[in-house]
Amino acid sequence: MPHFTVVPVDGPRRGDYDNLEGLSWVDYGERAEREDSDGQGNHRENSPFLCPLDASRGNDYYDRNLALFEEELDIRPKVSSLLGKLVSYTNLTQGAKEHEEAESGEGGRRRAAKAPSMGTLMGVYLPCLQNIFGVILFLRLTWMVGTAGVLQALLIVLICCCCTLLTAISMSAIATNGVVPAGGSYFMISRSLGPEFGGAVGLCFYLGTTFAAAMYILGAIEILLTYIAPPAAIFYPSGTHDMSSATLNNMRVYGTIFLTLMTLVVFVGVKYVNKFASLFLACVIISILSIYAGGIKSIFDPPVFPVCMLGNRTLSRDQFDICAKTVVVDNETVATRLWTFFCHSPNLTADSCDPYFLLNNVTEIPGIPGAAAGVLQENLWSAYLEKGEVVEKHGLPSTDTLGLKESLSLYVVADIATSFTVLVGIFFPSVTGIMAGSNRSGDLRDAQKSIPVGTILAIVTTSLVYFSSVILFGACIEGVVLRDKYGDGVSRNLVVGTLAWPSPWVIVVGSFFSTCGAGLQSLTGAPRLLQAIAKDNIIPFLRVFGHGKANGEPTWALLLTALIAELGILIASLDMVAPILSMFFLMCYLFVNLACAVQTLLRTPNWRPRFKYYHWTLSFLGMSLCLALMFVSSWYYALVAMLIAGMIYKYIEYQGAEKEWGDGIRGLSLSAARYALLRLEEGPPHTKNWRPQLLVLLKLDEDLHVKYPRLLTFASQLKAGKGLTIVGSVIQGSFLESYGEAQAAEQTIKNMMDIEKVKGFCQVVVASKVREGLAHLIQSCGLGGMRHNSVVLGWPYGWRQSEDPRAWKTFIDTVRCTTAAHLALLVPKNIAFYPSNHERYLDGHIDVWWIVHDGGMLMLLPFLLRQHKVWKKCRMRIFTVAQMDDNSIQMKKDLAIFLYHLRLEAEVEVVEMHNSDISAYTYERTLMMEQRSQMLRQMRLTKTERDREAQLVKDRHSALRLESLYSDEEEESVAGADKIQMTWTRDKYMAEPWDPSHAPDNFRELVHIKPDQSNVRRMHTAVKLNEVIVTRSHDARLVLLNMPGPPKNSEGDENYMEFLEVLTEGLERVLLVRGGGREVITIYS
């Protein structure tokens, strides 16, 4: 047998290689041409991340440090060349991108996208404030406090604010579960709940936003005609303040005019709306500050707004000036206008007077007593009224009697019947608007950070304003004034304006402009929402509304929005439109909470929100609260809203495809399973729904016992009881003779699955060859859409010592089968050292060595493992390799950004691997590998001799490797910078005694073998990577590593096994991962 000696040599200068016999320097700069398909199933798949990088591929292929992966670099590119693309994403939704490309017909020419730059304050917090504060605060909150009382008003505010806060928490979880492109709330809901629910809820949200525009316009008209310019009314009501047909017609005419003007403004350009947005917000803030200033001033100097009372009834002050029955003029008692109204005569005769007017005195009380007057105690309790009932003050003396019907218009009366539920429906729109920030997601610098912080902060701020306003109004304003919706008792002043400082006009003007601004914002946002739904193409008849002007403005959608808003204008009553608005928003919020609860309970791998302060119980509580509020405020409106959503759902489902509901004969379970399987079979899952569905291939011993049960343990830890797990095995033989054996093996595996707590199915096949049986399992396991997408395959231990080449041939053929089937492959090496389900790692790392990108499996697997109690405490580290021409600092930044978008917590490290010369150790090890392979083919050795020879080579490999990698400091100090080099000594070989009868004639030619250049490069990759990995990850709990693909030429299979051995040498637990050729993890929500 030939001998090898290990001798120290000088450092690796290029000239030293020339002294080695049979070694010539190879120039690796030139690359060979590549084919689109390798004939072994390694087909390309179109993907934004798995794409041929023709521009830079030339240098990549023959990079010495990555030569082991060179055959597949066109479909599995280098990480360094990919990170820039991964972190630079577009703000357009997928549907919008497809729509734009279809319209332009050329995807090549694109306008340079402007980078999003808005932060939390300007992008989320202030827009949410502007949308939440609205017309209800200024026009209805005082009336609500007077009607419901301070305590019940606080309860209404608490319920509504809790509803929006819980929804905001759920929305924050969804918004931080990936990058939220433009499309905001609709995008989040539709991508979380699917097209049917997403389309239904998206349209509900759109209708809610459209009716909000109508509500704001009606509020602006009410302010204009009631408080700013009452003479501008075209129609005059028969009574003083009743909502007669004349008043409603005024609202309709002016509302239509306002709507037309606002639509024209939005059509001309949304930039004008955005320019005035800050002005409108300033109006809101100034108005609120003036209310607080007036409340403080009322403590020591309350404003003078007297209220005229007849008995305990409140009189409407807009038709008379003097609050008295008679006055003395020139020592003569004369009747006032008030007497004239009640007695229908200027004379002081009581013949035709109203009986109640004669029996009760006229008094005047302060409308704003101030915070120090103690009216809060009187205003604590509710005073609900029926329609037409007079507003009365409790505690004032009054003689009850029937009055004249025509005198009713002189009192302040309730225009609608009130109750707790009615007030809830009217008030709820004043807490909507929480999605204004998420609707601007495309403009946010960091949506995952800004949306939760800005939205929740805005809700807390507005809630505090509402709570304090309720208490302030109850403490400062007289109860009868609070219940006076239109301010008739205080000379037709806006009630909240009477408290404001320095003037009521601050509130009147401020509220008018803020409601106009909110209406413009709604008319701007609603068409864009409809355009996003139309571009998704889930509702065919809406497709036309996806088109717009050349600059993308949704012209047709704006027209439809204006028409629907006109329906709200025709209703003409703010109190009637508000509950409709509440229904649609509550429906939307209900499904946001449902989406969060469902995602949390299903525990899909893609559900990794950065926002951690959520729980499915909070989402369920928010969903229940939304449903309860819908039926509490208006049960018939709730039914109509749910009917509309249901019809949209069924329409989208019908348009998508015909659905199979099952025959129902064999029971509900079978019907549901069949229906679900038929649904699943429609196509592959979306990237965000991808989870590993495992096919675990087990090896059985002669007694049909599982040889490596830790494979099942690993599968149970990876799955954590979720998803599909199929355990398969092959029995070699004839099916007719081995059927009973297969049944016994299946039962043995099922028992082991129960022990290891693997929830799944078992399948044992009988085949004449193990390779064929494994191929059959890979092809045929599963049913319909419930099929495996990942294969767990054990490592063939002892393949070097085996006399039968099938030991490693079966393994490599199975690798090729999984690649051809586009399945992911997981190969746990040293499986005996993997932890059991009863062990706990209290610390340590799971190290990911991301060499090439093949779909993101390497990032997803540690996340799934860490969901299990065994690996829960382990921290994740990601290493990637940088070459000489890579910017390692930028790579580290890009990788950190990419992981941030993936919502994965991991330490990031970029390892620089210089293009060092190929070491003599690498060269000699390659030579030994090829010589050993040649010798085993050529020599007719007995089994004993073959085992001894193979073990001898292995022992020399291990000893040399340990000496090279793990030499202690003492030896290093002696050797200095010397390297270890293996040298083939021909003299020793010639002097070696050996029996020529056991050797072929051409054995002597083995010493003249030159190692294949590609094998030298591959061995160099394996050695260098192994050195780096062992140095940094020798103490890791688990190392995940890209698995190189098998060679295209099957003659190099044995060398491929050797490369994998060298790559993983010295590591305790290794998981070799090979992606299936598709993306399995995404930064998007």
Curated annotation (Swiss-Prot):
Q: Which of this chain's residues are annotated to bind chloride 2?
A: Y589
> How does this protein lie in the membrane?
Multi-pass membrane protein
Extracellular side of membrane: 142-149, 226-248, 298-419, 474-504
Q: Does the keyword Transmembrane helix apply?
A: yes
List of glycosylated residues: N312, N331, N347
Q: Which residues bind K(+)?
A: N131, I132, Y216, P429, T432
Output the Pfam families linked to this UniProt entry: AA_permease, SLC12
Which residues are involved in binding chloride 1? G433, I434, M435, Y589
User: What is a single cellular component term in the Gene Ontology annotation?
Assistant: plasma membrane
Q: Where does the UniProt entry say this protein principally localizes? A: membrane
Summed up, the tissue specificity of this protein is: Detected in embryo, adult heart, erythrocytes, brain, kidney, stomach, ovary, testis and liver.
Q: Give the GO terms filed under biological process for this record.
A: chloride ion homeostasis; potassium ion homeostasis; potassium ion transmembrane transport
Q: Which UniProt keywords apply?
A: ATP-binding, Cell membrane, Chloride, Disulfide bond, Glycoprotein, Ion transport, Membrane, Metal-binding, Nucleotide-binding, Phosphoprotein, Potassium, Potassium transport, Symport, Transmembrane, Transmembrane helix, Transport
Residues binding ATP are L697, K699, K707, Y708, V730, G794, W795, Y797
Question: What does UniProt say on post-translational modification here?
Answer: Phosphorylated, phosphorylation may regulate transporter activity.
Please give the start and end residues of each transmembrane region. Answer: 120-141, 150-172, 197-225, 249-271, 272-297, 420-440, 451-473, 505-531, 555-575, 576-598, 613-635, 636-651
**PANTHER family in the record:** SOLUTE CARRIER FAMILY 12 MEMBER 4 (PTHR11827:SF46), SOLUTE CARRIER FAMILY 12, CATION COTRANSPORTERS (PTHR11827)
Membership in a protein family: Belongs to the SLC12A transporter family. K/Cl co-transporter subfamily.
An additional note in the Swiss-Prot or TrEMBL entry is: Activated by N-ethylmaleimide (NEM). Inhibited by DIOA.
What name does UniProt use for this protein? Solute carrier family 12 member 4
Organism in which the protein naturally occurs: Mus musculus
Query: What gene is behind this protein?
Result: Slc12a4
